[in-house]
Amino acid sequence: MKKLLFALVLLFSLTPAFAQQKNKVRLQAMYDSIKAAGILHPEFVMGQCIQETGWLACKKCCLRYHNLFGFYIKGNKCKKFTSETACIAYYKAWQDKRYLKWQKKHPKQDYYHFLKSVGYATGDKYTRELKPKVEWVKKNLRL
């Protein structure tokens, strides 16, 4: 029984790592698209994409609507996009509208603070979950 329990714990602990490696080519391509769009702080934004889509592998999230970043519209409904490219363009416009203005007022703050300030990150829990993903991006993708 202990061996079975150990095997299950091991299996579930390795599943995220397997998903990361399995999707690494797709994750790199997504990062490259984010960077090519001219989005600022692409490593953070890629971390958001990973957070919101479960490493680009979720089945019951906004990804089915090409929504890479968990944007919602009124009524708490997932915003739908025609393509991942359209979603990335939307993020770029969303960031352009907010970030530089915010940065002028808060020059010493980081992107985590920006996300919280504009209401994207709803609390400290989101930041705690996002940080390891951003670190993974910095360590494992070509920036």
Residue spans of the language-model regions?
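Catalytic cores of secreted/periplasmic lytic hydrolases that degrade extracellular macromolecules
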Residues: 17-143
